[in-house]
Amino acid sequence: MTDTIAILDFGSQYTQIIARRVRELQVYCEIYPWDTPPDKVQALNPKGYILSGGPSSVYEDGAPTLPGYVLESGLPVLGICYGMHLMAHSLGGTVQGADHREFGPATIEVTSHNELLPLGAQPVWMSHGDRLEALPRGFSVLATSPSCPVAAMGNPSARRYGVQFHPEVHHTPGGRDLLKRFAIEICQAAPSWTPDSIITRAVEQIRARVGGRRVLSAVSGGVDSSVATALVHKAIGSQLTGVFVDHGLLRLYEREQVEQAFHRNLGVNLIVVDAEAQFLGKLNGVSDPEQKRRIIGETFIRTFEAEARKLGEMDFLVQGTIYPDVVESSGPDRNKAQKIKSHHNVGGLPPDLKFELIEPLRYLFKDEVRAVGASKKINLLPIPRSVKRRFGVRWRLRSITARAASSTIWVER
């Protein structure tokens, strides 16, 4: 059983970054909206909890609250920004609006020996409009800054800690070490979340679910669908049939490259469908991006259903959905967070879907998908040069985007 950390999301746009930083430590974690039913979160059997930041104030009516099971569990807790305020507020501390909002670089002074932070001055990234004025019983001040009397607090005997700053962003140089101390030393989570363990777990789950039934894989030629197809093929072999849809929007020679790659490198039975007329006909005259995504998603599914009827009984459809696809497609009411966009794998699925979905990458970030694809345990290499080049560009862009995201002006409480 993989040791895990549960991250409760209180509406922060940094929450995915927290999860990525924890997984970079080879510790598995999952993100849950703060109001997720307790049994769903506790089924993860976490070794500890991280409470994200958020745009609310704990003293406002309707602000997200701390679920009772978090403190009742006796497990370690790390509150970040709003998460620290919420833990303090729930335990009898006092949180008030600050005279001035603080956004940007700051220097804290760690004044007390503790398990979380080394002594001395440290650069951090602040983003808050409230501050903690009175500590809850049992807590002490671990760090201060000129404008923040409680930059970090802790109750070591209860293994509860809070920080006003954001350790997850790269502007806090010591943030990775802080998260490592919390996840591995305080929570004692074993760093076992590796590409090989991901593959082993996925293959076991796919075999158990599919049994002797047949599976269609939606192949786009990109990295996500390639890795998803390779994982399922490793699990069930010839029970898998890949379907590549030529929708008329491909790169030059992409169809030929995909056909060659999947036949030669993966040994997957691949069917190529010429659906250019259907896709372009449905997209003709449509300018709204969300409507386009829905049209593309539904047209893909209808195309797969038509191929399944030709092939006989098909029970499952494989998609290369990854974790950001799911999070970014969340509705605007989720944690009061703004919907970014719907992904055609998620928001575009019709309600009368004829297949059960298999999404082996659903809980993986893009960098984890890349690492799985490079593992010797999966027969995906050599990745076709065309896909590898395309992936390299995407990987670099996503890396740049991740750094930019951690710099976005987003004042939390």
Task: Label every model-predicted segment.
Residues 1-48, 55-59, 65, 71-73, ...:
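RNA-binding accessory domains that recognize and position tRNA/RNA substrates
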Residues 83, 168, 322-323:
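Catalytic metal-binding/acid-base residues of hydrolase active sites
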